[in-house]
């Protein structure tokens, strides 16, 4: 990464990634910065109300991203109404909870509960403007209808201090993670891929085609906007989270803080079993996170993913399973 020379300026950050690529963890690194207004998966609200491949979806998504980056929520009442009742999205962002939520502790089991008011357009706009930096995390499939070079050029030109980080992960690990949370298929399909060859292969072929297209787009964007668009491997982030976090903050022109360092340290060292669920942002066992797919996927499943996603493996330097060298 090349450090920004404008560390005192306000920054806008867009995190792009495939689902199950570790983007929630990356987002939480920014979310723990006291000067960051962080928004987790805002476009998911549009998928509830709008046909994904329609012109209306494209227009609404572009407008929503522009309004978020410019702290203008007065015209986004429907969006805020949906976000008010989406716990995962809301509680992934400090700025959407702290001004609105009160916690109470139940005496009999010492559990904490939150009571939150609905998000208010004016308060949300003011909260955003009071934070120096705006960070938004979006999964690439929510941008697929219009994620192209022309839109990227327009987005960057209209937001002079916007930079983009494109997070990529070993496709074998992504498939294993998708299986773990049950997003696509039953566990038996992956664990016994040889008995469900057509179903599993069809999905993997589609997945790898999308991932290859996404990587091709990212490589082109990084070459054209090399000071504003960067590709990051998830594995590099979790191997040396403090070092990579510092490099990222330098790239975006955001100062490192004690709060971020504390979060990175805690998330890397925790042994709390409550943080082992599929949506946890704790990263206590690095080797397990990188290589758990080796135990979860059958050899047939691994070979299917590798044959279809080979360009991704080669370009991002992931070693095929037949090698003894770990990725």
Language-model features, listed with the residues they occupy:
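PAPS-dependent sulfotransferase catalytic domain
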Residues: 93-261, 269-282
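C-terminal accessory extensions appended to soluble enzyme cores
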Residues: 289-327
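Amphipathic alpha-helical recognition patches that constitute DNA-binding helices
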Residues: 14, 25, 163, 240, ...
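Short, well-ordered beta-strand elements within core beta-sheets of diverse protein domains
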Residues: 14-16, 232-237, 293-295
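PAPS-dependent sulfotransferase catalytic core
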Residues: 1-118
């Amino acid at each position: 990464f090349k450090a920004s020379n404008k560390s005192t300026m306000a920054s806008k950050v867009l995190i792009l990634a495939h689902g199950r690529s570790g983007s929630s963890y990356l987002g939480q690194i920014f979310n723990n910065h006291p000067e960051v207004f962080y928004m987790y998966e805002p476009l998911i609200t549009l998928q509830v109300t709008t046909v994904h491949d329609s012109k209306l979806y494209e227009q609404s998504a572009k407008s929503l991203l522009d309004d978020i980056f410019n702290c203008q929520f007065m015209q986004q009442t429907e969006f805020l109404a949906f976000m008010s009742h989406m716990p995962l999205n809301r509680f992934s962002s400090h700025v959407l909870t702290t001004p609105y939520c009160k916690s109470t502790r139940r005496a009999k089991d010492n559990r904490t509960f939150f009571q939150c008011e609905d998000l208010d357009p004016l308060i949300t706009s003011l909260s955003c403007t009071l934070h120096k930096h705006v960070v938004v995390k979006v999964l690439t499939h929510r941008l697929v209808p219009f994620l192209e070079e022309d839109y990227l050029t327009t987005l960057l030109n209209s937001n002079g201090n916007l930079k983009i980080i494109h997070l990529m992960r070993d496709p074998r690990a992504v498939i294993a993670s998708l299986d773990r949370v049950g997003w696509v298929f039953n566990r038996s399909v992956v664990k016994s891929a040889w008995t469900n060859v057509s179903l599993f292969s069809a999905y993997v072929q589609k997945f790898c085609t999308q991932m290859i297209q996404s990587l091709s787009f990212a490589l082109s964007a990084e070459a054209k906007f090399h000071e504003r668009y960067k590709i990051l491997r998830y594995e590099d982030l979790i191997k040396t989270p403090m070092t990579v976090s510092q490099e990222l903050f330098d790239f975006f022109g955001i100062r490192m803080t004690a709060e971020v360092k504390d979060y990175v340290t805690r998330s890397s060292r925790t042994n709390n079993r409550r943080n082992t669920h599929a949506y946890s942002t704790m990263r206590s066992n690095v080797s397990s996170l990188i290589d758990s797919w080796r135990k979860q996927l059958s050899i047939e499943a691994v070979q299917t993913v590798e044959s279809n996603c080979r360009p991704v493996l080669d370009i991002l330097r992931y070693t095929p399973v037949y090698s003894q060298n770990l990725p």
